[in-house]
């Protein structure tokens, strides 16, 4: 079925194909497994790009047909939309639409598409019989024929009848509209003629005087330009191959610049008057800037923007990397001088055009003056200072920049965010077509992407498309560096061969250079795919970096095309609920099956013509690059995933909010830049709960389930069992977060496994196993609490006597910021001391044997022999790593973070706030009549027991269990109650060090399933 859909899609014009893509998006968003004619009809009715169906429905309105003017004609279309919506709601849906497979085309929709194709072909055959000189060409189905065929479907006709419309009448109106002139779009022809549709009048009716068809040009403009038809469908506007026809050349398009003007005037946000234009491609964003400049030059703007000058202040990544601090400051001074010269005369305004803002977020710190100096960050600060200064003076100075979606996401993730620092307001420009992607079924294949550009005539052959795809920059960072080096050598060698007066100039020289550089790109593309097995491209390498290598004309003609084309990948953004990408064309090269078998065959183009093609959607995938899918995952999708990860971390570990952005940034860098698929993090500090919650949040956010997490506590686990668990996880699990607590207590065998994995990157790579593993190592953990996995007993003590607290030994007031991890039961402390002595002796033996294994010629004489000497000192783990081998391994982990709790105020507030809010929700805010307190030891139990369940589960426990206890208090009568204290249940039990065991806690956690209520007089 999907292969048939792909074949049918090749026979559609871009406008009809766009409707089909939107229908696929609608079905996917609603969770439907198939795309039906109802989806297509609903899309046709609500589509903003084509109002053909809506206009025909308005003409078919019974009030309009009888000659009476309806008060609101669009209400009938609104009723029809509701009818289609009800019909779509009746279709069976997937309970989890985000993780379902891609929708396929239903039999009814395939039949409708084939009917449209047959009607279109029948009309063309009739035309060609009357015009014998025209050869038979492949015909593409137009939107009119698609609408007529959809209306013939019984399900659509039934919905039309329910809304009071006749599908026959609507079809008649569509045929009448298309009979004015309806050119047929042919798939491949250098000379395109004009043909009418099957429903058009005969040629004799249109042209009584001759045998050639000469339609009225005014009708063509009315029927096609006002209906947003693409120029590539209209043969009257046929342009040579490769030429781009902009809409401004045919009729003025001013709507795109209106949002920018509103931002500049402060209509949307008075505090943010600077603009960043966000779009899929450079041509879209630069086109909006050009429209704005044209309108200001013509004076077609409000008075506040008239007499406004433009100043270009644009940079590139490569140029900034070689600029010193003095250069940046000089450029800013020159910019300020120009601004002052314009604004000092009659209150004129200035718009500073910053161009593409990728230099602000992708620029590195490789400066010529200092290794710690970043020219990009310095320039960002200077521009921010400039914005602040002019905003205080009231001068008319605006910033105008452009950005792709991935660049804008990075702008928001900077600290501080660039839109806040520069007072930027984003203006999103929709792309010319939706992004539906067709991937070949081969697991090693990446699909070719064809952008649906509405004003560009595409008549390239299949071979030309393959060459263009092969000419793109899709190699890794290492090969990109080698390509840039070779390209620089080629350019410099050309200039050194001949003297300047003998060197060739003009277009021929540029064409030759472009051909040579294109050959270099193809060479390094094939070499990278063969040698590096399609490693993910380094995001630090971008097409703009080649501006230092290529002349300006070559940069505009080749690399900018590549950068535009590479931006059309599947994305999910905040403003777009679901965007998919369709891709056409031949299949690309398959990667080598084995990386260790490198031969000359790897450099040959290996095209498989017979590979079955299907529609695939990259939803719910891991953010890590995989060989089985397109390794160049689009940046916006990664940025959104990382943004959601940061939100989840802030939700679960708010007391470590200062460290969380660095963790998310490290995860993102590990995903994008690391050559290995594993991510490694080393977390130190005494906050055990935060470390465990970090692991569980990473697991659920990136891999979707708690089952993809492995916890190994080297303090409590046996060495052999820990090694076996780690080996099994590396062999069997493809996606897993491995939490290794107290890695400083690891023995030699366990450490060898970690070191081998760290050095190899993929331990099972030679077996063809594709795994995505996050290693989270912890050390310097605080001492574990005894019985931490048992259910916490709780009781609500309601004191009616007004005497205050129940037990003076506790510190129950949550306002007093109870001290955590400070108290210890004397009996437990005694047992710990005895066990520590025995543990020390055994650990000394392990340390001694381990040193003999790793450093046979060196012996550490500083080992503790008498454990009793350190009784007065602070307790330390007895088997911390002292060997340089293990220390060097831990030091080699770049992502190192510290989770240390210095103050328990934030932790106390985190738990008490949720409990207090729940109490006020049930009992009401009666603080003047009674007080609510939480035992400090209970908060400590909460803190140490909530490591392996998320914040959402704790909130669920508060609503289901804790509030049930409050209802008991409420029903028992809260009159006369002075203090309600939530504390540990059974005071004598706690003081004697006994264990309160319950069969099972709330959903398998340490939280109880019930809370006892006690009324104390």
Curated annotation (Swiss-Prot):
Which GO cellular component term is one of those annotated? nucleus
The enzyme's E.C. designation: 3.6.3.-
Q: Clp R domain: which residues? A: 8-183
Compartments where found: Nucleus
Which PROSITE patterns does the record associate with it?
CLP_R (PS51903)
Function summary: Probable component of a transcriptional corepressor complex involved in salt tolerance through modulation of reactive oxygen species levels, abscisic acid-dependent stomatal closure, photosynthesis and K(+) /Na(+) homeostasis. Has an in vitro ATPase activity.
The identity of this protein, by name, is Protein SMAX1-LIKE 4
Q: Please tell me the species this chain comes from.
A: Arabidopsis thaliana (Mouse-ear cress)
Q: What is the lineage of its organism?
A: Eukaryota, Viridiplantae, Streptophyta, Embryophyta, Tracheophyta
Gene (UniProt): SMXL4
